[in-house]
């Protein structure tokens, strides 16, 4: 049990180090560039401006006002797309680093139970949570599962601590995979 605890602590430490490495790479390739700074400031400004306009608009607002809001939403969407494209080059570098590091660490922890889950994962996640482990106890956790969970959560928190995460206003306006969709349809 003590080796399992030591492995878990080591994996959390590895996740912190790889998240810091990823943010360092992103800072070098993206965050310090003038283009990124300009686009980020523009997105922030547009998000706040659009939020204010949406708060003041009424149901009986004129067609002209609704058109202005639609144009601003389109402009914001384009700037968000440009911002994503600027960040894309660092994503390739980070993906390459993470893949290389994950392969190396996966070979070190191959076949070792690194943690015990307090639940049985859903069947479609069991392939990841129980990867390269012997036995049928699906509460056993493999390196890859713990590493991915730790890296995802730690990296987000590091971005917030360093002030590099997108603002709530920009995230809210952009929609995104898990966020609410943009409310452009409300004015149609």
From Swiss-Prot:
Keywords assigned by UniProt, alphabetized: Calcium, Calcium channel, Calcium transport, Coiled coil, Endoplasmic reticulum, Golgi apparatus, Ion channel, Ion transport, Membrane, Transmembrane, Transmembrane helix, Transport
Q: Which residues lie on this side of the membrane: Cytoplasmic?
A: 33-86, 163-188
Localization per record = Endoplasmic reticulum membrane; Golgi apparatus membrane
Q: How does the entry describe its membrane topology?
A: Multi-pass membrane protein
Q: Which GO terms describe its molecular function?
A: calcium channel activity; ribosome binding
Query: Intramembrane annotation ranges?
Result: 121-130
Provide Lumenal-side residue ranges. Answer: 1-4, 107-120, 131-140
What GO biological process, any one, is recorded here?
Answer: multi-pass transmembrane protein insertion into ER membrane
What Pfam families does the annotation carry?
EMC3_TMCO1
Its predominant location is endoplasmic reticulum
Q: Which domain of life is it from?
A: Eukaryota
The regions listed as transmembrane in this protein's record are 5-32, 87-106, 141-162
State the coiled-coil residue ranges: 32-89
Its Gene Ontology cellular component terms are:
cytoplasm; endoplasmic reticulum; endoplasmic reticulum membrane; Golgi membrane; multi-pass translocon complex
Q: Which InterPro entries match?
A: EMC3/TMCO1, TMCO1
Q: State the oligomer form and interacting partners.
A: Homodimer and homotetramer. Component of the multi-pass translocon (MPT) complex.
The Swiss-Prot or TrEMBL record describes its family as follows: Belongs to the TMCO1 family.
Tell me, in a sentence or two, what this protein's role is. Calcium-selective channel required to prevent calcium stores from overfilling, thereby playing a key role in calcium homeostasis. In response to endoplasmic reticulum (ER) overloading, assembles into a homotetramer, forming a functional calcium-selective channel, regulating the calcium content in endoplasmic reticulum store. Component of the multi-pass translocon (MPT) complex that mediates insertion of multi-pass membrane proteins into the lipid bilayer of membranes.
Q: What is this protein called?
A: Calcium load-activated calcium channel
The species this protein belongs to is Danio rerio (Zebrafish)
Q: What is the lineage of its organism?
A: Eukaryota, Metazoa, Chordata, Craniata, Vertebrata
Q: Which gene encodes it?
A: tmco1
């Amino acid at each position: 049990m003590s080796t399992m605890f030591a492995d878990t602590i080591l994996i959390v430490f590895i996740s912190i180090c790889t998240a810091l490495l990823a943010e360092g790479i992103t800072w070098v390739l993206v965050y310090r560039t003038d283009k990124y700074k300009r686009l980020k400031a523009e997105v922030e400004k547009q998000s706040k401006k659009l939020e204010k306009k949406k708060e003041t608009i009424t149901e009986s607002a004129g067609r002209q006002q609704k058109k202005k809001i639609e144009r601003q939403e389109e402009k914001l969407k384009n700037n968000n797309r440009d911002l994503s494209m600027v960040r894309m080059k660092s994503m390739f570098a980070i993906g390459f680093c993470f893949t290389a590091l994950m392969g190396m660490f996966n070979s070190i922890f191959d076949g070792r139970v690194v943690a015990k889950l307090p639940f049985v994962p859903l069947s479609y996640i069991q392939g990841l949570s129980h990867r390269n482990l012997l036995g049928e106890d699906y509460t056993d956790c493999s390196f890859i599962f713990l590493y991915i969970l730790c890296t995802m959560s730690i990296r987000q928190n590091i971005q917030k601590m360093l002030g590099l995460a997108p603002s709530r206003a920009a995230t809210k306006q952009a929609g995104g995979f898990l966020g609410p969709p943009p409310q452009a349809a409300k004015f149609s």
